[in-house]
């Protein structure tokens, strides 16, 4: 007896979903133009010759602000469905959301006290 009997259609879907991108990329590689030259591999800067290095070092503070932004952006993504279905979920879900928010607020206070949000 096959245990996963009800999942036959899902297996077919999974195989097709994996094959479509592979076939599309293979077909595009077969029909693409095969010419190129040194101009093709140069960096394009608004139609003029590139000046200087292509790599630029960014200040680490940009990364800290980006990291804090991503954390609180993900928080918003998690809190929106909770806020929409708050009336049906009850008091336990409210406590879970408070725990989630308090963990994030503790992290924000920690980053603030460590000076991660200072721009000096």
Swiss-Prot record:
Its main location: plastid. Its EC number is 7.1.1.-. Keywords: Chloroplast, Membrane, NAD, NADP, Plastid, Plastoquinone, Quinone, Thylakoid, Translocase, Transmembrane, Transmembrane helix, Transport. One of its GO terms (biological process) is photosynthesis, light reaction. It is found in: Plastid, Chloroplast thylakoid membrane. It is a multi-pass membrane protein. GO terms for cellular component: chloroplast thylakoid membrane; NADH dehydrogenase complex. GO terms for molecular function: NADH dehydrogenase (ubiquinone) activity; quinone binding. It is an enzyme of class 7 (translocase). The chain crosses the membrane at residues 10-30, 64-84, 89-109. It catalyses: a plastoquinone + NADH + (n+1) H(+)(in) = a plastoquinol + NAD(+) + n H(+)(out); a plastoquinone + NADPH + (n+1) H(+)(in) = a plastoquinol + NADP(+) + n H(+)(out). InterPro entries: NAD(P)H_OxRDtase_bac/plastid (IPR023043), NADH_UbQ/plastoQ_OxRdtase_su3 (IPR000440), NDAH_ubi_oxred_su3_sf (IPR038430). NDH shuttles electrons from NAD(P)H:plastoquinone, via FMN and iron-sulfur (Fe-S) centers, to quinones in the photosynthetic chain and possibly in a chloroplast respiratory chain. The immediate electron acceptor for the enzyme in this species is believed to be plastoquinone. Couples the redox reaction to proton translocation, and thus conserves the redox energy in a proton gradient. NDH is composed of at least 16 different subunits, 5 of which are encoded in the nucleus. Belongs to the complex I subunit 3 family. This is NAD(P)H-quinone oxidoreductase subunit 3, chloroplastic. It comes from Chlorokybus atmophyticus. The lineage of its organism: Eukaryota, Viridiplantae, Streptophyta, Chlorokybophyceae, Chlorokybales.
